[in-house]
C-alpha cells in the first residue's frame, strides 16, 4: 500500500492545527474558515523551517485540512461538490482515522460519508434529505423597506 507523504503530514499535524484554530478563534475572533487558513499557514511555516516540504505537498496538506470543514456540511449540494474534489478520498481517510481516535460525533460523520460514497443517486438524495430534516437551514429574514423621509 502506498501512502502519500502529504497525507501523513496532514494526519500528524491535525491536532496541533486544531489547537491553533481554537486559539485564533478565541483570541482573534476569527470565523472557522479564516482560523483554519491562518493556523494552517502557521503550522506549515513551522514545518518548513525544519523540513523541506515542496509546494506540491503543502497544497495537498491544505486541501485535506480544509476539506475537513467541508465534510461537516451534509445538506443541499455540499456533499456532491465535496465528493467531486480531487483530494476527497484523502480527506475522508483522515476523517475515518479521526473517528477511531475521537469517537463521538466524528464516528457518526465518518459513517454517514462512508454510506454516502457507496450509495446510488436516489440513496444519496435520501441521505441528504434526512440531514436537512435533522438540521434545517435557518429561515431567511425579510425586512420591509423604509419609506423615504419627506423633505421639509
Walk through the language-model features, giving the residues of each:
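Catalytic cores of the polymerase beta-like nucleotidyltransferase superfamily
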Residues: 1-152
